[in-house]
Amino acid sequence: MRTPLPFSTIAAAALALGVLAAPASAAEPTTATLTVTGGALTITVPTDAGSLGTRANTVEGGTISGPLGEVQVNDARSAAAGSGWVASVISTAFTPPSGPAIAASAVGYTAGAIVKVGTATYTANDPPNLTGVAPAVTATGITGDNSATWNPTINVAVPGGMAANVYSATITHSVV
């Protein structure tokens, strides 16, 4: 037969468990952080534009125009709101293997349509000549990463009486 435990024994056991049990603690928050680093500001240009076009030589001269190829600026700097960049361009003279050159002052640049990704205001500046470093496309009011792509047209005013030949120039883009 079972003997019932006296109430005092049960109360003593419950008290002992209560005293020996770990006290409850308040929850403490943990702060976790992460860092997003900015990338680079880069420009990609065609390595070989090929021919801009052909034109018959005339006494009065004329213009030869053609596409240069796709130019792209990628801005992965995660820039703060309001910052921007400027893509610039410069050209050497168009020179033949022998004979007089066509000066860089006769070389113009038209950016054309700009394909945009990200938040910014893009402006095509279309410099009339490339004798010095000239802004081609600017981006202002940037927030975060962005990119712009365009396919510029190069316009060369060929003076009258130029010798029949193949003329070459180096067109250089940069971005800051």
Predicted regions: what they are:
Residues 25-117, 132-176:
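N-terminal small/polar-rich segments of proteins
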Residues 122-127:
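Intrinsic disorder and flexible/low-complexity segments
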